Amino acid sequence: MTAQQLDASGRLRHLLTLEGLPRETLLQLLDRAGQIRDAAVGRVGNKRQVLAGSAVCTLFFEPSTRTRSSFQLAAQRLGADVLNFDASTSSTRKGETACDTLRNLEAMGVRGFVVRHPDDGAVAALAEAAGEGTALINAGDGRSAHPTQGLLDMLTLRQAKGPDFSKMKVVIVGDVKHSRVARTDLHALRTLGVGEIRVCGPQSLLPDDETLKGCVVGDDFDAMLEGVDALMMLRLQRERMEEGLVPSLEQYHAQYGLTNERLARAGKDAAVLHPGPINRGVEVTDEVADGPQSWVLRQVANGVAVRMAVLETLLG
């Protein structure tokens, strides 16, 4: 898939996954996003019109609030016209395929597509069907990838703990097995050379494939917290309880919920990240979510800057 994302000169053509992308490409995107964020270009009233005259479509086949809104703001602040496609009210309900939808919108002059889909590989399949000069961005597909979330998480880590990823110890906590965010972050952490990657969660929620290769893996949260610089807490999907993978929300919180008492075991000023939406009282307490070590809202703010950087790189 790496070759599919890059053109013959090595320039990014689509952003489908972080897996296999060169370290230099990730750092270039992070550097550009950092410049945008530092200059406060991502704020209302301070726009860069590099995409004026271009059209971007958010093509979402799954519900989303933060990701869709973030991409919409990013595109608008670069001067693009934005179309919001809603599968529930579109011609796909009449039998039109996603590829036909893409081609029809291309014919109208849309150059950029931000796609979320419930199926693994669906965005890559659309990229294969896209015409020359059209760019696709994966806004989350199945369990496999959510590249802009991974980039904004890496930008937040760099802001919180400095530019030297090799000195960081990071723990990912929760339902790694079903999480596209976790898989994406693991690819990014490895590519950027993070010193130690720990993964913690119930055995029923940890993958048994190559996903965790090279990671320190365990189910004792208190032990895994010792000396970490950052914690990446994952959302527990309620359906996991219905599937019997988690006995109860209360028991999950007792074993894997982040409290101030547990946070004290981590390294000094350890940063707390969460992709949202947060289940308060399950993954984290109110005190942690709203506390001084929470970087959650800064992740959200960084998301706009990251998505501006990606859109600018692909379409600018």
UniProtKB/Swiss-Prot annotation:
One of its GO terms (cellular component) is cytosol. PROSITE patterns: CARBAMOYLTRANSFERASE. It comes from the Bacteria. It catalyses: carbamoyl phosphate + L-aspartate = N-carbamoyl-L-aspartate + phosphate + H(+). Its EC number is 2.1.3.2. Gene3D superfamilies: Aspartate/ornithine carbamoyltransferase (3.40.50.1370). Carbamoyl phosphate binds at R66, T67, R116, H146, Q149, G276, P277. GO terms for biological process: 'de novo' pyrimidine nucleobase biosynthetic process; 'de novo' UMP biosynthetic process; amino acid metabolic process. InterPro entries: Asp/Orn_carbamoyltranf_P-bd, Asp/Orn_carbamoylTrfase, Asp/Orn_carbamoylTrfase_sf, Asp_carbamoyltransf, Asp_carbamoyltransf_Asp/Orn-bd. Catalyzes the condensation of carbamoyl phosphate and aspartate to form carbamoyl aspartate and inorganic phosphate, the committed step in the de novo pyrimidine nucleotide biosynthesis pathway. Heterododecamer (2C3:3R2) of six catalytic PyrB chains organized as two trimers (C3), and six regulatory PyrI chains organized as three dimers (R2). HAMAP family: Asp_carb_tr. This is Aspartate carbamoyltransferase catalytic subunit. It comes from Stenotrophomonas maltophilia (strain R551-3). The lineage of its organism: Bacteria, Pseudomonadati, Pseudomonadota, Gammaproteobacteria, Lysobacterales.
